Amino acid sequence: MAPTVLMVAEKPSIALSIASALSGGRMSTRKGSTDVHEFDGMFQGSHAFFKVTSVIGHVLSVDFPPAYQNWEGTDPMDLFVAPVLRSECNPKAHIRRHLAQEARGCTYLVLWLDCDREGENICYEVIDCTGIPKSEVGRRIFRAKFSSVTEKDIMDAMNNLVLPSKDEALAVDARQEIDLKVGVAFTRFQTRYFQGKYGNLDSRVISYGPCQTPTLGFCVQRYQQITTFKPEKFWSLKTYVIKDGNEIQLEWDRKKLFDFDVTVMFQKMVASDGILKVTDISVKEECKARPPGLNTVNLLKVASSALGIGPQTAMHLAERLYTQGFISYPRTESTAYPSSFDFRSALAALAHNPLWSNDVRTLLDTGFVKPKQGHDAGDHPPITPMRLATEEALGTDAWRLYQYICQHFIGTVSPDCRYTRTSIEFTSGGETFHCVGNRVTSKGFTSIMPWLAVSENNIPAYKKGDAVSIHKVDIYEGSTTPPDYLSESELISLMEKNGIGTDASIPVHVNNICERNYVQVNSGRRLVPTPLGTTLIRGYQCIDADLCLPDIRRFIEQQITLIAKGEADHLQVVQHVLQQFMKKYSYFVKKIENMDALFEAQFSPLADSGRLLSKCGKCARYMKYISTQPMRLYCVTCEEVYYLPQNGSIKLYKEIICPLDGFELLLFSMVGPDAKSFPLCPFCYNSPPFEGIDKLFGALKLDDTGKVGKGAGMPCFLCLHPTCKQSMITQGVCACPECTGTLILDPVSAPKWRLYCNRCNCIVLLPHAAHKISTTDKKCPTCESTIIEVDFNKKTTPLKDGATLHEGCILCDELLHSLIEMKHGKSFFMRRGRGRGRGRGRGRGSSRGRRGSSRHDDPKMSFRDF
């Protein structure tokens, strides 16, 4: 029997490319969690049956056990020594189960994951999921190394299989554990400490990250240079001569002086002389070197500065171009091509695009030059176009990025730009002036990269010893100016220089400081720190500057590199780094008042923030509504904070009082045409009076997700109070046909009356011709749903003889059922004799038990967010 070879790629599109190349297009495909492509072929000299499938990035993520996920019940200090576990990144995708099923009965496993450290780490995740022992590496388990998804590269990789690198996989494990524990410990402490104290502190999570925070530190450092800058006046001489009827300005060798009187003295000396003597003429042949190969960091910098595309977006576009086979692997630190690289084939693939066809054909006909010797990081060749694309196929931004990659590659194999530089030196009154002219003799690579062209300017011809009359000598007055805010491109350069992040993670860190509201991206993609970002960095600086300096992260990256090279034990590195951060965390906690003083100076206390909105059920005084994230109410008298649902609007709801606690109800409205609106009691929402409600409703809350703060859980549509007219008991109509929830009458949806599910996004549109719709205390004898009363408009009533009032069950009453419409769900069938009732939130019971038991215990705060 022929052996079975399971091959696993990182993305479905790459799996398809691999299968197509190895099978010659003769394969069958069947559906699974990801597609499985099957074909017959040869493996290690024997006939074999191949199965090619894929994961979708990382299969497993590192996290804390459930016992450590409660923000209130866990001391952040304990996280440094807490165990970590690996759970499936996306349980709904069922990748783990898929790999285990496909691996059954397989003889060999070939790993086609991306060829970087993350890819090596995913290799071992895949091995764990398949159940094949790690001891089989080299016998049954192999690794394919490739830099593009072209047929040639795939065939070469298949013919030269290697082994996955355990050391590189362990290096990623070490970084993940360090970033998780350090980031979550600091984040939980400072978020809990500062949230709820200040009303205009606009942030749900005040996060810390070993990479994220030094990245922010660079932005704040530039901001501080700008705010502390003091302009200073300066003066310079502008000397002019007339040649062939043209006025020519000469540059003063002293550039500028900061003493006006001295500048005036030099002006008088030159003016009194009246003649400029040509003392030297220099003519040199200069060369502007072609660029080396393109690596990830340089691509991101150009995308931001020249194309206006942010690093995160640029990386996503580059990855898409790679998976579609248009470019080589986009995550590389190398700028040097291997000696065996086939430049002629790469150029020939681009010859038919009219934008650069002339340049390419010239290079192919007259000969191209090899790129400059760059840096060889030993990972992947520089980013290179692999096949021709069109703007229509890629879309605007992807095309612009692809176009630059093509132009850069063509530039690397083009000749250098050559030009003649002429410099003429003049003297007068003991002062020296000069003028410089450039004349391009060979455009070289700048013909394909015109933005790098040498500026040409012709200067008049003079001979040494010529005496030239001075036309005028002016004094120019100016002031020094502060530096501009850091651009994304400049920030990326600083991160690379200081060892912050990797070519793969740099875009994530830059994006995170924007997402966390620490900086804002202004015109020119310049990063302006917010008050929160500035105050955080100033706080770290006054407690422990190491927390926001790049030195620690640089040290960590160096240690992780040693692990990847097999020169350091990953457990010892993790233990050593965490011990250092434990000491810093302990000191930070003791000195947090220093940071708090800065927050107090920048932000307003809750008592001074917000507007009066609703009455407190405890003291009967009006509470203040704080609209900044996270939205909340604050009772000045009781000094209590009540968190509210986020990402919507809040207003008082008809001055209705909750019968359980005396608080005034609020109406929360989500955003969007089909979004829900629902009433809630602030106290019940934060402290659900019925057991299990907070778990039933997947609202955000501090002790589970760290997104909102304390508590959150029970709007009125989940309340089980038997007589309250806003509760699920009185407003619930029937079980949701899509999930285990209950359809609730939307109290403010008139005139477009509707029901919405209290668990999923299912919406049922009720008769629009109704003047009023309300629930009754009657039950349908057939299905036990609540009978509703509909008051139709007189002009549009469907009832006989102009009647307007009608009672019925929306499931069993033929008239009402014909007038309702289902949205965001499956078809809504009439029920006959099922007798399941409304379910009181349980809907169809055990038939959807698995969906109903979904948990919301994702704290995540994992390393990817820091």
From Swiss-Prot:
Top-tier EC class: isomerase
**Biological process GO terms, please?**
DNA recombination; DNA repair; DNA topological change
Q: Which domain of life is it from?
A: Eukaryota
Q: Which Pfam families match?
A: Topoisom_bac (PF01131), Toprim (PF01751), Zn_ribbon_TOP3B (PF23546)
Q: Has UniProt tagged this entry with the keyword Oxidoreductase? A: no
Site (Interaction with DNA): give the residues: 71, 188, 195, 331
GO cellular component terms given for this protein = nucleus
Spell out the catalytic residues: 329 (o-(5'-phospho-dna)-tyrosine intermediate)
The segment annotated Interaction with DNA runs over 207-212
* Residue ranges, compositional bias (Basic and acidic residues): 854-866
Note how many cofactor molecules are bound and how: Binds two Mg(2+) per subunit.
Region called Disordered, residue ranges: 830-866
Q: Pinpoint the Topo IA-type catalytic domain residues.
A: 165-585
What catalytic activity is recorded?
A: ATP-independent breakage of single-stranded DNA, followed by passage and rejoining
* Function summary: Releases the supercoiling and torsional tension of DNA introduced during the DNA replication and transcription by transiently cleaving and rejoining one strand of the DNA duplex. Introduces a single-strand break via transesterification at a target site in duplex DNA. The scissile phosphodiester is attacked by the catalytic tyrosine of the enzyme, resulting in the formation of a DNA-(5'-phosphotyrosyl)-enzyme intermediate and the expulsion of a 3'-OH DNA strand. The free DNA strand than undergoes passage around the unbroken strand thus removing DNA supercoils.
| Domain Toprim as annotated: residue spans | 4-149
- From the UniProt record, report the name of the gene that encodes this protein: TOP3B
- Please name the GO terms that the record assigns under molecular function: DNA binding; DNA topoisomerase type I (single strand cut, ATP-independent) activity; metal ion binding
Q: Please state what the protein is called.
A: DNA topoisomerase 3-beta
Q: Write down the EC number.
A: 5.6.2.1
Sorted alphabetically, the keyword list is:
DNA-binding, Isomerase, Magnesium, Metal-binding, Topoisomerase
List where this protein forms a coiled coil.
Answer: none
Binding positions (Mg(2+) 1): 10, 114
Q: Where do Basic residues bias regions lie?
A: 830-853
